[in-house]
Curated annotation (Swiss-Prot):
Entry EC number(s): 2.8.1.-
Any Gene Ontology biological process: tRNA wobble position uridine thiolation
Main location: cytoplasm
Organism for this UniProt entry: Shigella flexneri
Superkingdom field: Bacteria
Subunit structure of this chain's protein: Heterohexamer, formed by a dimer of trimers. The hexameric TusBCD complex contains 2 copies each of TusB, TusC and TusD. The TusBCD complex interacts with TusE.
Bilayer-crossing regions: none
Gene: tusD
One GO CC term on file: sulfurtransferase complex
Keyword Phosphoprotein: no
Protein name: Sulfurtransferase TusD
Length: 128
């Protein structure tokens, strides 16, 4: 079965992103296909390259990145929500005249079209 996940909570401070990550790992372990994860609203903070959790905490941001690298899961970030919250890639940083970017490698700034496509092409869409 093909799945897509929507994450609306930040990497730290709520359980939404952590639960979504654990669900993603369970899907893959059970042989399902996870096509994409779409980060929306506060969920865009999962793509912030500048997070630095305590040494005894799981690094959820890098966990998502590993999911992308190891399993080819698309990590789509809502561009409008990201820009409002200061998450930018190199292209947007240049366009906006910012000194640097902070989008974690493996994540892609995307429009809501990416979510619509996932909804149409996957068997299930699960929101956290």
């Amino acid at each position: 079965m093909r799945f897509a996940i929507v994450v609306t909570g930040p990497a730290y401070g709520t359980q939404q992103a952590s639960s979504a990550f654990q669900f993603a790992q369970a899907l893959i372990a059970e042989g399902h296909k996870l096509s994409s994860v779409f980060f929306y609203r506060e969920g865009v903070y999962n793509a912030n390259q500048l997070t630095s959790p305590a040494s005894d905490e799981f690094d959820l941001v890098r966990g998502w990145q590993q999911l992308n690298a190891q399993h080819g899961v698309a990590l789509n970030i809502c561009v409008a929500a990201a820009l409002r919250r200061g998450i930018v890639d190199e292209t947007e940083a240049g366009r906006l005249g910012l000194a640097s970017s902070n989008l974690q490698p493996g994540f892609t700034l995307s429009g809501l079209g990416a979510l619509a496509e996932a909804s149409l092409t996957c068997d299930r869409v699960v929101q956290f």
